[in-house]
Amino acid sequence: MANQNKAYLALTVTSIVWGTTWVASKMGVMHMPAFEMASIRQFLGGSLYVGFFLIKGEKLPTKKQFLWLLGMSLLMFVSSNGIATYGLKFITSGLAALIAALYPLSVVLIERYYYKAIEIKPKTIIGLCLGLLGIGFIFYKDSLTVHGSNYILGVILSFIAMITWSIGSIIISRTKININA
């Protein structure tokens, strides 16, 4: 299979898996505590990830690398995914997906604010707008439905989750750690 076809296949699989996690998480929080469900999901995913690299013959991280990974896991998986999953108790999966789709925009804006040298190019703005419009088109019917008195709490939690994921992504991209991840 050509590299370009592999890339398209990977993008398609990632889009389907990522897109369905919002609906699956929404269903899950109806039947179990949100942080328990998020923990199970992250544990299974992490175990498969580590297993894949061990099968390939990769070494386990050093103590320093492990501590860094632990810190990033707390920021991104506990804070972001845990809070996002908890927020799904109060809002629709479509609205949660729309808020999460603001992630690329928040990364660009945070990087621009803190790292002034970063230029926001027209291509970047067009890509961000098209991505957000695409998610909006898919979830527009579901996204603005208000359910229950804790709706605002769900929106706030989803925004906090999106911002913590953005900050974690920026930290990872700017930290030089020699690890195969």
Feature map (PLM): residue ranges:
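Specific transmembrane alpha-helical segments of multi-pass solute transporters/efflux pumps
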Residues: 16-17, 21-22, 51-100, 136-137
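Residue-level signature of transmembrane alpha-helical cores of multipass secondary-active transporters
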Residues: 10-11, 15, 69-73, 85, ...
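Transmembrane alpha-helical segments that form core, pore/gating elements
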Residues: 49, 107-109, 113-114, 146-181
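Hydrophobic transmembrane alpha-helices of multi-pass small-molecule transport proteins
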Residues: 49, 70-72, 104, 110, ...
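Transmembrane alpha-helices of multi-pass small-molecule transport proteins
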Residues: 31-79, 104-110, 164-168
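Juxtamembrane helix-entry segments on the extracytoplasmic side of multipass membrane proteins
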Residues: 3-7, 31-35, 39, 61-67, ...
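Specific alpha-helical transmembrane segments that line the substrate/conduction pathway
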Residues: 36-47, 76, 84-123, 161
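Juxtamembrane helix-loop-helix junctions in multi-pass membrane proteins
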Residues: 16-47, 92, 167-181
